[in-house]
């Protein structure tokens, strides 16, 4: 469903999704919730993902069953030179693996990759700069 105050342009919305913020040129999977004051642009949000309030997501692919806290920014900010080659700038997508948590008040730059099953402990600085990666081994069950 879509609240009366939400703005959704050029989008595909899955069944059971609730959008209270804005969605622009994005795919929103089934059972996704996007909180008040949040903006999703040019992104793919897979089923079961919960997005908090006042979140900005730009050019991201977020896998199934993720949790994005309040006041998070994904793929927003200045383009920065690559840490290994200053002639290469980080304009790329943000990718987040399944069952991951991005806690409230975290900033994630452009061209970043976050593996599946991350938790708030994986963000001790509260920031992931453009071009950086978080890799976390899955459970060995």
Where are these regions (language model features)?
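Left-handed beta-helix
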Residues: 1-141
């Amino acid at each position: 469903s879509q609240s009366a105050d939400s703005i959704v342009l050029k989008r595909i919305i899955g069944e059971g999704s609730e959008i209270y913020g804005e969605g622009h040129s994005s795919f929103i999977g089934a059972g996704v919730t996007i909180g008040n004051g949040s903006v999703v642009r040019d992104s793919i949000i897979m089923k079961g993902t919960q997005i908090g309030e006042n979140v900005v997501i730009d050019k991201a692919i977020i896998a199934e069953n993720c949790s994005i806290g309040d006041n998070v920014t994904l793929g927003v900010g200045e383009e920065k030179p690559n840490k290994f080659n200053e002639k290469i700038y980080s304009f790329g997508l943000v990718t987040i693996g399944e069952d991951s948590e991005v806690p409230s008040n975290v900033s994630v730059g452009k061209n970043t990759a976050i593996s599946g099953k991350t938790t708030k402990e994986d963000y001790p600085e509260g920031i992931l700069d453009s071009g950086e990666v978080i890799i976390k081994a899955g459970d060995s069950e």
